[in-house]
Amino acid sequence: MKKLILSIALIGSLVSCQAPAEKESEHSHESTVIGYEFSDEGEKQNLIVGDVSIIDTYMEFIQAHNDRDIDKIMDMVQDSILIKTQDAQELKGKLIHRQVLEEWFPESNPIWTVRWMATNTVEVKDGENRHWLTTGIEIIETLDEKERKREQILDVNFVGKMIKEVSIYERSKPLE
């Protein structure tokens, strides 16, 4: 009887140590839904893991800002670029974008540092999926010989490798 109990215990422990077999899922070909976006009409649209290749494009875009390479920045945005600023302005088009950068760069010498990034894609029914990068950055500006630090979260919409829209949310850091 002791041998029988010992054998059952041994077999039970061996079976429990085996890795579980991978189950085939009828949904295994589908993307993982990580959240939802709601359209203006209230329609729920899947938010799925995004294309991480847009991270390289975004890092190149930030480097162009730090290098003050306005021509390169303009090459990376669509003609109809829309920038929704932290103070509720909407900058529309390359011309306005260029003018703002040409004034801002010499005025405050901003430096960008990327802190984090995440990509996602909105699955749109009967339309083209929208690819987004959400990123946290720090900007250090020098105004009147004093440094000012700002933290921003940006939602950046990509069409291919071109930036179509940017929404900026900001928190100013206290002066030190």
Regions found by a protein language model. Give the residues of each.
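Short, cysteine-centered beta-strand-loop-beta hairpins and adjacent loop/turn segments enriched
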Residues: 140-149
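Short, low-complexity N-terminal intrinsically disordered segments enriched in polar/charged residues
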Residues: 18-67, 71, 75
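Positively charged n-region of N-terminal signal peptides that target proteins for export
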Residues: 1-4, 18
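A short hydrophobic beta-strand element
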Residues: 128-139
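A solvent-exposed, acidic/Ser-Thr-rich amphipathic alpha-helical stretch
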Residues: 75-121
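C-terminal motif of bacterial Sec signal peptides marking the signal peptidase cleavage site
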Residues: 13-16
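Short beta-strand edge/turn micro-motifs at domain boundaries
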Residues: 21-24, 149-176
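Hydrophobic pocket/interface hotspot
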Residues: 61, 72-74, 81, 93, ...
